[in-house]
From Swiss-Prot:
Gene from which this protein is expressed: argC
Pfam family, one: Semialdhyde_dhC_1
Keyword Cell membrane: no
Active site: C146
Enzyme class (EC, first level): oxidoreductase
Keyword field: Amino-acid biosynthesis, Arginine biosynthesis, Cytoplasm, NADP, Oxidoreductase
Function: Catalyzes the NADPH-dependent reduction of N-acetyl-5-glutamyl phosphate to yield N-acetyl-L-glutamate 5-semialdehyde.
Family (UniProt): Belongs to the NAGSA dehydrogenase family. Type 1 subfamily.
MF term (GO), any: NAD binding
Reactions accelerated catalytically: N-acetyl-L-glutamate 5-semialdehyde + phosphate + NADP(+) = N-acetyl-L-glutamyl 5-phosphate + NADPH + H(+)
Annotated metabolic or biological route of this protein: Amino-acid biosynthesis; L-arginine biosynthesis; N(2)-acetyl-L-ornithine from L-glutamate: step 3/4
Enzyme Commission number(s) of this protein: 1.2.1.38
Protein name: N-acetyl-gamma-glutamyl-phosphate reductase
Record localization: Cytoplasm
Length: 342
């Protein structure tokens, strides 16, 4: 029997990516598509690549429209998911691709988002220690942010194996789709092409507390994070370069062994052969993650680099993967697409 899925926020990048993946899922029937500001328009006018759904008309996001579905994907701006979710029954699997339910500490939410904390849901990054167990049978899932996905997968093996001191320095470049679909002057082609620029510098980026939360859980102690995001002249993808001071006695061999153990059975995370480095082009449009790690003996630092597609593994692919686990379906179902090259 097909799993009936609704997507709220179908006109945006995250909602569109979710639909692209859901179309390839053999157990899914796509139900209601909503988009408040675009209600009444055909999806094809807003997401012309979704040809099988082009004639579907967007509806307003309301409990009546979303009723009668097994799963509801929420692709809404932060602060809007909670109001919709509380109107959906406890038997509906709600997968929130926004930020509302990711953080455990209410003070972190209020500091970085400036509104009351809505609560915390099981976290949709199965590769983290205990991640799959938290998702199995769950009816509520908080999909991680794109940067925290890339950073957490790059660094958690070092912290879980007690190889790194509890402080990390991260510089990550992201494609422009990470900023959403709304028109913004700094995202105009003439502003972005041929240029890279940092933003959210000095610990103010909203994904910072999520990284601290994940790495601290892996380490078993608080981890400080210095995070500098950079806007790259590409539509999608994240390349995260993460460094942490190594503990005494660490060797290149012990670092490599920790990463091999962490990712040995992971279907989507690929620890590359030594000497090969992650590239966003290699994971474009896929749920794959490329990871490489090195040990700088002179500086006594562990360097871990990851590449993801921010819209796929970083958002909608991670959502679909988590949905599969929650429903007891094979984890890779609907996610067999590999990267596009060149």
């Amino acid at each position: 029997m097909a799993v009936r899925v609704a997507v709220a926020g179908a006109s945006g990048y995250a909602g569109g990516e979710a639909l692209r993946l859901l179309l390839a899922h053999p157990e899914v029937e796509i139900g209601a598509l909503t988009g408040n500001s675009n209600a009444g328009q055909k999806l094809g006018a807003l997401q012309p690549h979704l040809l099988p759904l082009a004639d579907r008309v967007l509806q307003e996001t309301s409990p009546d429209v979303l009723a009668g579905h097994d799963v509801v994907f929420l692709a809404l701006p932060h602060g809007q998911s909670a109001a919709v979710a509380e109107q959906l029954g406890p038997d509906v699997l709600v997968v929130d691709m926004g930020a509302d339910f990711r953080l455990r500490n209410p003070a972190d939410w209020e500091k970085f988002y400036g509104s009351p904390h809505a609560g915390t849901w099981p976290y949709g990054l199965p590769e983290l220690p205990g991640g799959r167990a938290a998702l199995e049978g769950s009816k509520r899932i908080a999909v991680p942010g794109c940067y925290p996905t890339a950073v957490s997968l790059a660094l958690f093996p070092a912290y879980a194996a007690a190889l790194a001191e509890p402080e990390a320095v991260i510089v990550a470049a992201s494609g422009t789709s990470g900023a959403g679909k709304a028109a913004k002057p700094h995202l105009l082609g003439s502003e972005v092409m041929g240029s890279m620029s940092p933003y959210g510098v000095g610990g103010v980026h909203r994904h910072t507390p999520e990284m601290i939360q994940n790495l601290g859980a892996a380490a078993g102690e608080p981890v400080s994070v210095s995070f500098t995001p950079t806007l790259a002249p590409m539509p999608r993808g994240i390349l995260a370069t993460c460094t942490a001071k190594a503990r005494a006695g660490v060797t290149a061999e012990s670092v490599r062994a920790a990463y091999e153990k962490a990712f040995a059975d992971e279907p989507f995370v690929h620890l590359l052969p030594e000497g090969q480095w992650p590239a966003t082009a290699s994971v474009y449009g896929s749920n794959a993650v490329q990871v490489q790690v090195a040990y700088d003996a002179a500086a006594q630092r562990i360097i871990a680099i990851s590449a993801i597609d921010n819209l796929t593994k970083g958002t909608a692919g991670g959502a679909l993967q988590s949905m599969n686990i929650a429903l007891g379906l094979p984890e890779e179902l609907g996610l067999s697409t590999i990267g596009v090259a060149p």
